Amino acid sequence: MTLLGPDAYLDHIRTESARFADVLATCPPDARVPSCPDWTAADLVAHLSGVQHFWTGIIAGRPVAPVDEDAEGRAPLASYDDELARFRSTHDTFVATLAAADPAEPAWSWSGPDDQKVAFTYRRQAHEALIHRLDAELAAGQVTPLPAALATDGVHEALDVMYGGLPDWGRFTPGEHVVEYRMTDTATSIWTRLGTFAGTSPEGKVYADEPDQHVVADPGTAPALVVAATASDLDAWLWHRGDDARVAISGDDAVRALVTGLLGQSID
């Protein structure tokens, strides 16, 4: 499939971040976030604020890698209103920094070798803002559909990057079964091939014949399993924010069980 362009991603970062802040402004700070049960609304706004602050530093300092890849947290502020104000200010700085950067320039990311460019941040942060906008809406009881074009891209990103990323120290051995993820409203399908993963991480952890799946081109053969929904519902579902009843799954029972296990892992 054709990915969105950097201008589209930047527009979505702006739009989804604005909706995120506007919705959270209607919530009490202790409102629970159903999709992140350990979080309150205050935790959610602090999280996305920290994420956008972190990636501002990555883009401003490109291509240097961060000293601490997990350093997204910042000291809490005195009030919820202060946190919301800091988010809006942080967001403005992030967007300005990203807009001034050429997507083709080298920049660190936690993803694979092909994603060590500014373009990765454009795309990843559009989806980060989108999914956390949904979290905010769930907390406020004000859920709206995800934009179809961004959600279609989001299904691909979830399957290809979040679930299907392949580190350079690992190897994927393809199996016989293919799964089709079909978006009924955008006439788009994404296929994954099931297989196994093996390798030894830099920390010395050994993986042997772990079930895995990776995005492939349309194989031109019948899939063993079809997962179908609108782009909005499928993207939300892959991120564990959606309703199972809004996703239709048909095909081989054993393949379904395997895919259910693969998609059950946390990608937050």
Spans of features found by a protein language model:
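Structured surface interface patches that mediate subunit assembly and partner/cofactor docking
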Residues: 1-11, 26-27, 31-37, 60, ...
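Amphipathic alpha-helix face/heptad-repeat signature
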Residues: 9-16, 47, 83-90, 121, ...
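Helix-turn-helix
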Residues: 39-41
